[in-house]
């Protein structure tokens, strides 16, 4: 069964590698604007005009390949459907947001209220799909289990909304989000194999394959960005996978980078309002803080490659620690 997932991953990666250049050509041919650049970060000046919405390619390819594989290998289960649904619907939200920004020149895209309402609705539907295949509504913490009944629906909504936006914040420099999420998903692939949840493993490996294919064009200097269509989908997918594998708490370690990125923004905003304009960090999310010199006081900060490598290694180490703790209990 693991081999089936690996084959799906390789197919997804190859199709993504073939599809991305054509997507980039489409953007250039239509002379569409790229993802907005940060004026405060001089290193980002060269990114102006770089195509975005690349997540559309790896999301669609991952969805199609995993669906075909699930039907062929008999893994079209409630768990697979739930993961597939969340990944697809969060991609739809991101696609609409990107579409308004890029094609309609509406800088704001979807409003915060529109995004939140859509995410809540997806969370509610996800709860009912998940409940069809689950007899209990249990949250797992190490060796303890907590059956929270109907409140599990609220947990799913909060979990999905929180993690989707956290990954969205992490997608700020070349290659950062794509490989960080790939590492996180690899940890969940290990858990899926250990518990023989090959239905969930199938879509996990398909998404990893898509991310690796996308990274070929997203590493520094990026030829394309994933956009909200990619980052929101990946965050929601990570959240639902942790639930489906009954390993919710592990995401706090496996996804520590996303937590830190989000907390840096929250702390910055709160401190800015409290002090009337003072800042804790040079810029948030925190990866931009390191780009601008961090706490060193120097004008020159870390290169994007250095930030990527540090964040990837941090995620890999914490993922291993999370797995060790998980299997110990």
Swiss-Prot record:
Provide the disulphide bond pattern: none
Pfam families associated with the record: Glycos_transf_4, MraY_sig1
Q: How does it sit in the membrane?
A: Multi-pass membrane protein
* Any GO molecular function: phospho-N-acetylmuramoyl-pentapeptide-transferase activity
Cofactor(s) this protein cannot do without: Mg(2+)
Q: Does the keyword Cell division apply?
A: yes
Q: What is its main location?
A: membrane
| One of the GO BP terms on file | cell division
Pathway this chain belongs to: Cell wall biogenesis; peptidoglycan biosynthesis
This protein's superkingdom? Bacteria
EC number assigned by the record: 2.7.8.13
Q: Which InterPro entries match?
A: Glycosyl_transferase_4, PNAcMuramoyl-5peptid_Trfase, PNAcMuramoyl-5peptid_Trfase_CS
Q: Where in the cell is it found?
A: Cell membrane
Where is the chain membrane-spanning?
A: 1-21, 53-73, 76-96, 109-129, 141-161, 173-193, 198-218, 237-257, 309-329
A GO cellular component annotated for this chain's UniProt record is: plasma membrane
Instruction: Write out the catalysed reaction.
Output: UDP-N-acetyl-alpha-D-muramoyl-L-alanyl-gamma-D-glutamyl-L-lysyl-D-alanyl-D-alanine + di-trans,octa-cis-undecaprenyl phosphate = Mur2Ac(oyl-L-Ala-gamma-D-Glu-L-Lys-D-Ala-D-Ala)-di-trans,octa-cis-undecaprenyl diphosphate + UMP
Keywords, in A-Z order: Cell cycle, Cell division, Cell membrane, Cell shape, Cell wall biogenesis/degradation, Magnesium, Membrane, Metal-binding, Peptidoglycan synthesis, Transferase, Transmembrane, Transmembrane helix
Report the HAMAP family cross-referenced here. Answer: MraY (MF_00038)
Family, per entry: Belongs to the glycosyltransferase 4 family. MraY subfamily.
Function, as annotated, reads: Catalyzes the initial step of the lipid cycle reactions in the biosynthesis of the cell wall peptidoglycan: transfers peptidoglycan precursor phospho-MurNAc-pentapeptide from UDP-MurNAc-pentapeptide onto the lipid carrier undecaprenyl phosphate, yielding undecaprenyl-pyrophosphoryl-MurNAc-pentapeptide, known as lipid I.
Entry protein name: Phospho-N-acetylmuramoyl-pentapeptide-transferase
Its source organism is Lactococcus lactis subsp. lactis (strain IL1403)
Lineage, please?
Bacteria, Bacillati, Bacillota, Bacilli, Lactobacillales
What is the name of the gene encoding this protein?
Answer: mraY
